[in-house]
Design a protein with these regions (language model features):
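Conserved nucleotidyltransferase catalytic core and NTase-mimicking acidic/glycine-rich helix/loop elements
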Residues: 1-143
Length: 143
């Protein structure tokens, strides 16, 4: 697939509207899928840009690192945040099933301990940094 710079510019710009925030201190609940989506989307964008054929987000992250398209810190942070958020999502699904409810992605952080809240807030921060990096890499700030 051949793409041009304007495609990546527009796609990186489109991801800006999905900047995650975590409602851990309010009475609102958070859609955990909306926290994960920008991470997987930006990784897909970089994979497409550099011709990475990985099938999963983790595979793409690893191949981006092996190809020296991302540095070790981005590799480590992306994998950790992807793992933490998906672990939280699957834990929530299991809790729903055990309670006899249909699983969803809406998480109430009032029922979690401070560690879960902390790593979820950290994930949102890392994902926002990744969105900013994509904006810089694909020149969304200059137009």
């Amino acid at each position: 697939l051949r793409t041009n710079d304007i495609y990546f510019h527009h796609m990186a710009s489109a991801w800006k509207q999905f900047r995650p925030s975590v409602n851990t201190k309010s009475d609102k609940k958070t859609d955990i899928k909306k926290l994960i989506m920008p991470l997987t989307g930006i990784i897909r964008l970089y994979a497409l840009k550099y011709g990475i054929d990985g099938f999963s987000t983790l595979e793409r992250i690893m191949e981006l690192y092996v190809g020296k398209f991302i540095d070790y810190n981005l590799l480590r942070d992306s994998i950790r945040e992807w793992k933490d958020l998906n672990s939280l999502r699957l834990t929530h699904h299991a809790t729903c099933i055990n309670s006899g409810k249909e699983p969803d992605n809406i998480v109430d952080f009032h029922i979690f301990n401070s560690d879960v809240i902390c790593y979820t807030e950290q994930a949102a921060e890392i994902i926002n940094d990744l969105i900013l990096k994509a904006g810089n890499d694909f020149y969304t700030e200059i137009i």
